[in-house]
A protein has these predicted regions:
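Juxtamembrane helix-start motifs in multi-pass secondary transporters
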Residues: 37-45, 100, 125
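Hydrophobic alpha-helical transmembrane segments
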Residues: 16-24, 44-52, 124-143
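Substrate-agnostic recognition of the 12-TM MFS/MFS-like secondary transporter fold
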Residues: 15-30, 45-46, 69-117
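Multi-pass alpha-helical transporter architecture, strongest
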Residues: 127-167
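Juxtamembrane helix-start elements in MFS-like secondary transporters
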Residues: 6-15, 62, 66, 101, ...
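Transmembrane alpha-helix termini and helix-breaking/packing motifs in multi-pass membrane transporters
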Residues: 1-6, 26-36, 54-58, 109-137
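C-terminal transmembrane helical hairpin of 12-TM major facilitator-type secondary transporters
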Residues: 39-81
C-alpha cells in the first residue's frame, strides 16, 4: 500500500481509522442486537468479513480498495466480539466457561504456529481466511436454524400443556 512517489504510508492514521471502525462496530452490534438476536445477524457478520478480506485478493494492486476492505473487516470485528460474548453466555454454562476456553487456546496456538512456520504467500493466506470465514457463516447459519427449531419445539410443547385447575 505504498502511495505514489514511494513515500511510506501514514501508518498512524491507518491504525487510527481502523480503531475507529472497530469502535463503530460495537455501536453496530448495539443497533443490530435491538432488532435481532446475535444468532441471526452473526451470519451476516461472517459473510461481510469474508467479502471484506477477499477484496485484496480479488483486486490486487488497488491499495484504496484493500484499505476499504480492511476497514470493513475492522467494523465487523467490532461487532463480532460483543456478539460472540453474548452467544457464549447463552450457550456455555458459567461453571465450565473458563475450562472450555482454555481447551481451545492450546490448539489455536498450535495452528497459529504452524501457519507462521509454513511461509505461505499473502494470496494463499487471504484465500484460506476467506474460506474459513465462509465456513463460519455456514456454521453460524446452522446454529441459528437449530436455535429457531428448538424455540419452536419449546413453544409447541408449552402450548400443548393443559392449564392447572384448582379443585
Amino acid at each position: 500500500m505504498t502511495p505514489p512517489g514511494g513515500e511510506k504510508p501514514p501508518y498512524g492514521e491507518i491504525f487510527s481509522v481502523m480503531m475507529i471502525c472497530c469502535m463503530a462496530g460495537t455501536r453496530l452490534f448495539g443497533f443490530l442486537a435491538e432488532r435481532d438476536p446475535p444468532e441471526k445477524f452473526s451470519r451476516g457478520l461472517f459473510a461481510v468479513a469474508a467479502c471484506a478480506l477477499a477484496t485484496p485478493v480479488a483486486l490486487p494492486g488497488r491499495p484504496t480498495w484493500a484499505l476499504a476492505g480492511f476497514l470493513a473487516f475492522e467494523l465487523v470485528v467490532g461487532a463480532y466480539f460483543p456478539a460472540m460474548g453474548t452467544l457464549k453466555s447463552k450457550i456455555i454454562p458459567d461453571a465450565q466457561r473458563a475450562t472450555i476456553y482454555n481447551l481451545f487456546r492450546v490448539p489455536l496456538n498450535v495452528i497459529v504456529l504452524l501457519v507462521l512456520l509454513s511461509h505461505l504467500d499473502t494470496v494463499q493466506v487471504f484465500t484460506a481466511v476467506v474460506a474459513l470465514l465462509a465456513a463460519a457463516a455456514a456454521l453460524q447459519h446452522a446454529l441459528y436454524v437449530a436455535t429457531v427449531d428448538y424455540s419452536k419445539r419449546v413453544v409447541a410443547i408449552e402450548s400443548d400443556k393443559e392449564p392447572l385447575v384448582a379443585v
